[in-house]
Design a protein with these regions (language model features):
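Conserved loop->alpha-helix
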Residues: 1-231
């Protein structure tokens, strides 16, 4: 579990697709002054661009993780190259301040940057998700994790299939997204609370339908929505 508050920006040194163990490994170097690995242990979880990965080896200023094929298919990690910069966050502890929101490190899809527009010293980014199904979990003023950074949705358009976030000057210095351009991608994890709410409502409605109570309730809801729409 993570908070979406990026702790450090690391730099890719190697992305090895022919690791001796048959998998893909990714090695990240840290700035000389970084203390990110000061309490690191083998097997610890670290989010790299929002993807929860397991530390397999580490030195004081670098570490290596293994990447599963499914992770490469669902995320933008496979497009990383030496010198690519990535967002890093350690897993939360019991005493961690929740400065962002609950982030699992389980990426739902990627999104492409459609536009990048300065607004004073802030920047507004517009994103279109590869998997449009995630849009039902994206709401105005809601949380969304982009490359692991907890951000607030400032605008969303379900019909056209995009949402926007705004990065203030401080945030631009702390995450890699600010340096990305139109056409580049970010990893997306929607707020898991929305998924739990959807699952609960689906179960509740299914139970009502089995009891024969669901149809009248649904009819009343539709009538109310129609009445509001034409009032």
């Amino acid at each position: 579990m993570f908070t979406g508050i990026v702790e450090e920006i690391g730099e890719v040194t190697t992305l090895n697709t022919t690791s001796p163990d048959g998998g893909t490994t990714l090695t990240i170097a840290l700035p000389p002054t970084s203390t990110l690995l000061s309490d690191c242990h083998l097997g610890d979880s670290i989010a790299i661009n929002g993807v929860c990965l397991t530390v397999t080896t580490f030195l004081p200023q670098s570490f290596t993780v293994g990447i599963a094929p499914e992770t490469l298919r669902l995320t933008n990690l496979g497009s990383l190259t030496p010198s690519s910069r990535v967002n890093l966050e350690r897993a939360v502890r019991a005493d961690t301040r929740m400065g962002g929101h609950f982030v699992q490190g389980h990426v739902d899809t990627t999104a492409t940057i459609l536009s990048k527009i300065p607004d004073g010293n802030a920047i507004t980014f517009r994103f279109a998700p590869k998997n449009k199904d995630v849009l039902r979990y994206v709401v105005y003023k809601g949380f969304i994790a982009l490359d692991g950074a907890s951000l607030t949705v400032t605008k969303v358009n379900d019909e056209e299939g995009w949402w926007e976030v705004m990065l203030i000057a401080y945030t631009q210095e702390k995450i890699v997204t600010a340096a990305k351009g139109v056409g580049e991608t970010v990893n997306v994890e929607v707020d898991m609370t929305a998924k739990y709410v959807e699952k609960s409502i689906q179960g509740y409605l299914a139970g009502m339908m089995e009891d024969g109570q669901g149809l009248p309730w649904l009819q009343k809801m539709v009538e109310r929505i129609v009445a509001q729409g034409f009032s």
